[in-house]
From Swiss-Prot:
This is Cell division protein DivIB. Residues 1-46 are cytoplasmic. Belongs to the FtsQ/DivIB family. DivIB subfamily. The gene is divIB. It comes from Lactobacillus delbrueckii subsp. bulgaricus (strain ATCC 11842 / DSM 20081 / BCRC 10696 / JCM 1002 / NBRC 13953 / NCIMB 11778 / NCTC 12712 / WDCM 00102 / Lb 14). Residues 8-31 have a biased composition (Basic and acidic residues).
Amino acid sequence: MARKRITRRDPEEELSKFLRHEPGQGQETRKLSSQLTSLKKERRRGLLTRLGSIMAVCLLAIAFLTYYVSPLADVSTVRVLGADDLDGKSMVEVAQIKASDKVVDALRGQKKISKKLAAKYPEVASVTLSVKGLNTLNMQVHERKVSGYIKDGSSYREILANGELGTKSLAWREFDHDKPLFISYSKQVALKTNLKIFNSFPEYFKKQVKMLSGNTRRKTQMILVMKDGNVIIGNTETIKSKVKYYNSIKQDLTTNSVIDMEVGAFTRPLTSAEKKAYGLS
C-alpha cells in the first residue's frame, strides 16, 4: 500500500493569515457601522410617523363619532336667508328638515334639498346649507332674477328670467315699478316669446320700457309701452335690431306717438282710445 505524501506547514504562518491587519479595513468597518445606525434611526423615525398618523386619524374618528351620537349634532334651528317673499316655515317643511335630523346628514343632502325647493318654488334657483355654531343650520336661498310682472286678476305675479311665474300674489304697491308690466297675455307661449325678446334688448333700452301688451293683432306683433308715453309696435323677428333707433326717433316727436317698426319705421300721434287702452291718459 502506497504511503500518502504529507506536506509540512508552519503553524505561525497559518495563524498570521488571521491576525494580519490589512490597511483601510477598520475604516470600512466603521463606515458600515455608521450606515447601519443611520438606517435604524430612519426606520424608527418612519415608524413613529406612521404610528402618529394612525393615532391622529383614530382620535379624529372617535371625536366625530362622539359628536355624531350626541345631542349637539342634532339640528336645533333652521334659519332661511335670502327669500323674504317666501314663507320660511313652509320651505323648511318642504325641505323635510326636522329637529331630530343630524346636521351632517342635512349637509350631505344639500343637493337633494335644493332640488325639492326649486321644484316647489319657481323663484328658487338653488339652496346652499351651512352651519353656524354647533347645530344651527343656515339655508341660503338663491332666487331667480325677476324680469317683470304680470297682471293676474286683481293682483300681480313675478315673471322670472326663465319665463316661469312666481307663486306669490302681489298688490300694486308691492312690486318693483322700475320693471315692466306684462298685460293681456292669455297664452304662456306668447309670454315666454316676448320675455325672451325683451331680455335680449340692450340694458339702457329695457330701463325705458314701462309695459308690454299681449293684445296684438298678429302672433308676430309685439307692443311696448314706454315710460315717456310713446308706444312701439314691432315684429318679433326684427324688433331686436330696430330698438337702437328709438332714442333718435323720439327726439323729433312733439307729442306722445305710436312708432311702428314692423315694416320700416313711421310715426303717428296716439289716439284717445289708444292712450286709454295703454294707461297713458
